[in-house]
Structures are given as structure tokens and as C-alpha cells.
Amino acid sequence: AAEGGGQVTLLEPNDRLGKKLNITGKGRCNVTNNCTVEELLAHIPRNGKFLYSALVRFTSADAMAFLEGIGVPLKTERGNRVFPVSDCAFDVSGALKKRMEKLGVRWEHDRAVSLLVEEGAISAVQGEKKEYPAAAVILATGGVSYPGTGSTGDGYRMAAQQGHTIVEPHGSLVPLVSDDSCCEQMQGLALKNVLLSAQNEKGKTVFSEFGEMLFTHFGVSGPLVLSASAHLRDWDKHTYRLSIDLKPALSEEKLEERLLRELREQSNRNMENVLSSLLPHSMVPVMCRRLGLSP
């Protein structure tokens, strides 16, 4: 807006700018994905078409060009993920702040409380400290996922005040809690190149992807699990079953052949040693107990 010649005022309730941006991507800041709009939409679990017009007007290529234009060199990593070359989120927020200052954007340390309307149009924003007259207002408050960074749901509340229907937000890109004790027994174990699938209560597969995951003391986490969480609806009301294929490159028949071959060739060794050639070491005793096998 400022680059287009507008006089811009930014209302920021935090004591510093970019508080949430600085912790994204584990502090590295995954700024976008280097792919087409169609590819981006294909990875949005629900109602991706709603974002089409916005993404077409400002594509990931536009975002990359903008950031590099204000002095943030970028790199593309596995999965088309784009990061600053420095691997430092503060470089991104710092460059944005400098650009704001150069364009004369005014920063007010204040929280927006409500939108003021006159004759059917928004005329001002009411802050906690004062009123801000405005010819146009952009709501860019974030969601409600991390209140400590300022994402407290203010945008939902102000939009609802103006008559918009708000769909109840649900967690996405989050770890999952499991009631299976095996998870705690294998906490810290990371799995790579596995196939994770999720089935709903009717047995329908709602998610299935290859990648990496991690067992924790409360359940499972890691890239695959975070992606899966976006596909699991209303988990406070429903349960889901997760299946992990440790050898996705092998068919069930091929895997059985390999297991039988290992058992024949290592008939003088105990089961734990035999399975160690097929499973991660820390998983073997857990699986033996689960299956009632003597290690």
C-alpha cells in the first residue's frame, strides 16, 4: 500500500515487530514455496479455491522477487521450501522493517479493538489508545494459534462485528496425541522414508504421504504428522487411526519373503537380532512385546 503511494499506519500490539515471523521455520523462516499457484492450492486441505484470487494476484514468485528486492537473498530446499540464505528469520523481519521506514510507514504500538463504520463503509479503527481514521483497512492479525506472539483471534472478532460468518478454527500443523503406550516407549525415535496413513472411524483413508516423523512422550510429531493434522477434522469429537509403513518400497509379499529369508539365514540368532536388520533398533523390543514374541 505504501509503495502505491498510500499513507499507511500499522497497528502492532506487541512491543516489537515480527514477533511471530521470527520464530517460524524453527527460526529459519520458511517464507514461501517455490511452485505454481495450482501446486500451492493442491496442498491446502480444505477450500483452497477461496485463496485462488489472492494467490494469483501475488504469487510465490512475486513474494520471492519482493524479498530479494529488499535485500534478502533466498534459497530453495527440498520440497520447494524457500528460506533466506542466512537461515535467519530476523534477517527477513529486519529487511521488512527497514522497507517500512524507507516508505514512511507509521508504526503505532496499539491494539485494534473494533472497526468503525459510517454510511456502510469502514471509516476508522478504534484502538485501545485512540481512534485511527482510515479510507481503507487491511486485517492482517494472524489467527489464534499462538497468543503469546499476538495471534489472539482479534481478526475473527472484528470481522464478526461487521457481519461476517466465522468458521470455528481448528488446529493445523500440530503434533498428535496418542493413547498407545508404544509411542512413549519409543519417544525420540525418528523415522525416515516411511508412509504414514490416517483412517477415520469409518475406515476411510483421509491422509497418506511419504516422509519423516518422530515418536514423542505424548504421541507423534515431525513433518509427516504436522501435514496429517490438517486433514483430521474435529479431533475433539472423533478419533483417527494412524498406520506406518516402514518399508513402503516393498510389497507385503516381498517383505514376507525377506523376513522368512532372514529367519532361515539367522536361525541361530534370537528374534531381536533378526528384526534389527529390518527395524530401527529401539523399536525392536517394543514390537516384540507388542506381538508376544520372545526377544
What role is predicted for each listed range?
Residues A2-K26:
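Glycine-rich FAD pyrophosphate-binding loop
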Residues L10-E12, K75-T76, W107-H109, L139, ...:
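General beta-strand structural signal in soluble alpha/beta enzymes
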Residues L11, E108, A112, V125, ...:
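Short hydrophobic core segments
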Residues D15-L17, N22-I23, V31, E38, ...:
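An anion/pyrophosphate-binding glycine-rich loop and adjacent beta-alpha core
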Residues K19-A54:
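N-terminal glycine-rich dinucleotide-binding loop that anchors FAD/FMN and/or NAD(P) in oxidoreductases
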Residues S53-A136:
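Feature captures the FAD/FMN-dependent oxidoreductase FAD-binding
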Residues P73-K97, Q162, I166-Q187:
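Rossmann-like dinucleotide-binding cores of NAD(P)H-dependent redox enzymes
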Residues A136-C182:
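Glycine-rich loop(s) and the adjacent beta-strand/alpha-helix scaffold that form part
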